[in-house]
Every structure is written in C-alpha cells, then in structure tokens.
Design a protein with these regions (language model features):
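Short beta-strand element of the alpha/beta-hydrolase
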Residues: 190-192, 200-210
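Hydrolase active-site cap/lid region
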Residues: 305-353, 408, 416-419
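Gly/Ser-rich "nucleophile elbow"/oxyanion-hole loop immediately N-terminal to the catalytic nucleophile
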Residues: 257-302
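C-terminal catalytic histidine-bearing segment of alpha/beta-hydrolase fold enzymes
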Residues: 387, 394-433
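Proline/serine/threonine-rich low-complexity linkers at boundaries of modular beta-sandwich domains
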Residues: 23-33
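N-terminal cap/lid segment of alpha/beta-hydrolase-fold proteins
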Residues: 38-42, 152-197
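Cap/lid segment of the alpha/beta-hydrolase catalytic domain
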Residues: 210-276, 333-340
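Short beta-strand/loop motif that positions the catalytic acidic residue
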Residues: 373, 379-381
Length: 433
C-alpha cells in the first residue's frame, strides 16, 4: 500500500483545457481564505486536538478586526459547536477539538462585507485509516452479480460505429459507438478513440460522472489515444451526445432522480443495466483487433470512479483500476449516525429508509465491490469534498485488499487537477504488461 500526501495553503494554478496557466489570484474573488492545520498533512490521531490558523485577505490585504462566524461538525453532518472569532491583522487560531472515533471534522467559516457573504470550510481527519463502512454486504452478493453477468453474456455483443471527424486527430481516430445493452433495445453511447499506426494497444474504459448530460469534453484526455492507448468515454442513459440542450433538459426532468428509480428491488434498480452495460463495454474493447490482448483498465471520477470499481470487480480481465473520489459508497451511512456517500440517501429523510431500499443499496454499494477487487488500484481524493466526502473515499480504500496506492490532496473539493489526471495515465502505463 502506498499513500502520497500533498498539503497546500493556496491553490496556485488556474486550469483551462489541457494547459496550466499560473495566476496570482485564481479564485478571482474579493476575499481569499487561507486555513492551515497545525499538522501539515491535515491528519491527526483520535484524541488529539487540531488547531487551525485562519487568515482572511480582502483585495490581497489582511483584514483586521473582522468578526468571523464559525461552526464545527463532523463530515457532512450538522454542526455541534458554533462561535465567533476576531481576526487580528487578518489572522486567528482556533482549536476545533478532536474526535473519539475515526472520521473528519469540518470547520465552516463565514465573513460578511457590504452585505455579501464569503464562506469557506476546511476538513481534517482523525485516524481515517481506521474508518469502517456502515453498509453491510449481502450474503449472496457475489452470487447475485455472477448470475447477472452470466445472464447478460447470453445476449450477443451488438453495436454500431460511425466515424467522428471533429474528434479525430493525426494520431488517433474517433468513432461514435452505440452499444446495445439489453435484448429489449436499451443502449449506451460512447466515443471510441484508437491510436493510428496499426499496432496493438492497451485499452482503457472511462465511465461518466453523475447526471443526465452529454459526454463531457471528449478530447480532454486525448493523450491516451495519442499516447498509444485505446480509450472509451461513455454515457449511461442511452442519449445521443449531439442531442440538443432542450432534449437533455427534458431528459433531466424525466429521470434526474435515476439513482432512486427502482430502489425497492435490486433486479429492477436503474443502475443494474448501467453496471452491466459498463462491463459490456469491456467486451467491445477486447473484441477490437487493435487491442493488445492483455492490458485492460478502468478509470473515472465520482460516479465514474464508482463505475470504474464496479466494472473492474465484475470482469477479471481488468488488470488495473483508477478512481477519483468514488460516489455510491457507503450509501446507507447516515442511518448509522455517520457520514454517507453520494447521492446521500436518507440524509434528510431517514424515515424513507425501508428494508427493501436498504437491501437494494447493499447490492450496489461500491464498498462491497471494492472488497472483492483483485487488480491493482490507484485512488485520489480531497478532504474538502462535500459531494463525495473523504470519509467514504477512505472507507472504500480501507477495504481494498489488492495492491493499492492513494494520492491524498487535502485542499481539493470535488475536483482534480490536470497533473493528477495525467498521473493516472502514467500509472496505467506503468501497469501495462
């Protein structure tokens, strides 16, 4: 197991496309918060107090005498402490206390200038390597999915492909794929990038983040195709990527709550066809004459990170998995009076947690897939993430028993940088046989 830690006071890079341009003040806000835990890695042992220095600059100048409101609470949970502090020459220290159990504490700050609120927050961890998920694994979890995959394989690989000139370069070709995922006609779309040159290449499957939307920025990871890897970037709802924005708006209205659809029955849950459809894309990749016959990877972030893990577990041909802050992890966590993962089922409405819904989520929780991974895994996550909180990312990482490494980027919220994404590519290259 390998863990890399990076702590920083300021975000010093503004990112655009594939280039990185330095700016003195990338946030472009009147106010800049700087919060610096007294442990450089933002990590503490349970029972150990955390002291955080708070700095606030307006137009780059330290503000003096300003009263800052603060609250403190566990990761994604209501505050259990509140107060105010007064900045002296733009600075103050606050002891946020400790935790008796492993987890994260969140210091939430707010300053007001001329009627405008300037919020900020910072999370620090307490023995997070000891975090354990709340979600239970069904006794027949592996049998459920083995049966589902076996049934799915009875349906032959069926897809169409058409060239896409606007995403084709001198080093790679691009095709739009429509992959049929069920005998009844359901489908998923994807862009397939294949290096030019006539060789045999590793293949990488990249599922999408959450939402009902088009395939985002297909060329943002062009260095895969241009660097000698076959790559698929897909969507999961069967929506043509050239559908109009009005069309996507209509679809979002119709199925924006897809992560709740069919939740009373694991065989009827919306995500069953998605999980199986993602695995089916591996059949497509491995059927290509350009595939090298031995290297197959999954890679994604958020919901895509979740699907990278589930797909890798469902197909033992995968020899490497990369996941940024995976969603769909410890989804019933809030029922245990702790942090739960995206999409935060039952956080505000625990009364809706019927035994049927809980049972279904157990079959689809990424934690339970991660327990059974047998390929090398690279993960990355930030501590300040309020979409896929660090608590659940640690829980996923902690249950993985295969070779694993983590890049910890404490200041990150729900994003990664271009260098981090490029690092995934380099890691995949290093794992090729």
């Amino acid at each position: 197991m390998k863990i890399l830690r990076f702590a920083t006071l300021l975000i010093i890079c503004a990112l655009a496309g594939l280039s990185m341009t330095a700016e003195n003040y990338p946030s472009r806000s009147d106010c800049l918060w700087v919060t610096n835990p007294d442990h450089s890695d933002w990590l503490y042992e349970t029972g150990e107090d955390a002291v955080i220095s708070v700095e606030l600059y307006r137009y780059g100048v330290p503000v003096d005498g300003v009263t800052v409101k603060y609250t403190i609470g566990d990761d994604m949970l209501p505050a259990d402490k509140e107060g105010t502090l007064t900045l002296k020459n733009g600075r103050a220290d606050i002891n946020i206390g400790t935790m008796k159990k492993p987890g994260f504490r969140d210091l939430r700050l707010e300053a007001n200038f001329d009627g405008h609120k300037f919020p900020h927050h910072v999370k620090v961890g307490f023995s997070p390597e000891k975090l354990k998920p709340y979600v239970k694994e069904p006794k027949d979890f592996r049998e459920f999915w083995a049966k589902a995959v076996a049934e799915d394989k009875k349906f032959p690989l069926t897809y169409s492909a058409e060239p896409v000139k606007k995403y084709t370069t001198d080093k790679m070709s691009c095709q739009l794929i429509r992959l049929q995922t069920t005998p009844g006609g359901k489908a998923m779309y994807a862009y397939l990038f294949i290096p030019k040159g006539g060789g045999k290449y590793p293949a990488v499957f990249c599922p999408p983040g959450a939402g009902v939307k088009t395939i985002k920025d297909p060329l943002i990871h062009r260095y895969y195709g241009e660097g000698g890897m076959i790559r698929i970037e897909c969507e999961i709802h069967g929506l043509h990527p050239d559908l109009s924005e009005e069309g996507f708006a209509s679809e979002r209205k119709a199925r924006g709550n897809y992560l709740d659809m069919g939740l009373d029955d694991p065989d009827e849950y919306y995500m069953k066809d998605v999980y199986l459809g993602c695995r089916r894309f591996l059949d497509l990749l491995t059927s290509l004459p350009e595939w090298d016959g031995k290297n197959l990877f999954t890679q994604g972030g958020s919901q895509g990170g979740a699907l990278a893990i589930t797909t890798a577990m469902l197909d033992d041909r995968v020899n490497g998995c990369v996941a940024n802050h995976p969603a769909l992890s410890d989804m019933t966590g809030y029922l245990g009076d702790k942090t739960g993962g995206y999409p935060h089922h039952f956080r505000k409405n625990p009364e809706e947690a019927t035994p049927e819904k809980i049972r279904t989520l157990e079959y689809y929780d990424v934690v339970n897939f991660a327990r059974h991974l047998d390929c090398p895994v690279r993960m990355t996550w930030g501590f300040n993430d309020n979409t896929c909180p660090p608590t659940t990312s640690y829980e996923v990482f902690n249950v993985i028993s295969s070779p694993k490494e983590a890049l910890l980027t404490p200041i990150n919220e729900h994003w990664t940088t271009v260098p981090t994404e490029r690092g995934h590519y380099e890691w995949i290259k290093s794992k090729c046989k």
